[in-house]
Regions:
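Alpha-helical bundle regulatory/interaction domains
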Residues: 1-135
Length: 135
């Protein structure tokens, strides 16, 4: 029987365990580590990545790599919202926003803000800078 998850956003904001051991452990790892790849999660769980991917797909019907990537986008959005609130409006020039994007990318585990923006575009329909300007 598949454990159906409505959305990654629902998983991201959920705080109660589901009772599915693999599912709950993966979510706990995502909440506490800056991981990008299923191999990293599998290493922490001490399981083969192939087995983890298969188990995750059986439980959720989604690919683990897609969930991890979307999770990181949600974390970046949360961090950007928080930091933007701390920056005064007169400092919100393009240069300051680029610095904020670099800081966010590093904090959320991406190699660069360019990579983060590319992923943002895929998941949000806009680059991270354009998304940030809408706030």
């Amino acid at each position: 029987m598949k454990h159906i998850v409505e959305s990654v956003e629902e998983m991201y904001h959920a705080r109660q365990p589901t009772g599915e051991v693999i599912f709950d452990e993966v979510l706990d790892i995502l909440r506490h580590y800056k991981l990008i790849y299923p191999e990293d999660v599998a290493l922490l769980m001490d399981v083969k990545v192939r087995d983890l991917r298969a188990a995750w797909f059986m439980l959720t019907g989604t690919r683990l790599v897609d969930v991890i990537t979307h999770w990181r986008v949600l974390q970046a959005q949360d961090w950007l919202r928080k930091r933007l609130g701390e920056i005064s409006t007169e400092r919100c020039e393009k240069g300051e926003l680029v610095k904020l994007l670099k800081e966010t990318a590093r904090r959320c585990g991406w190699r660069s803000e360019v990579v983060m923006s590319h992923v943002f575009k895929r998941y949000c329909g806009t680059s991270a800078l354009e998304w940030l300007k809408t706030l």
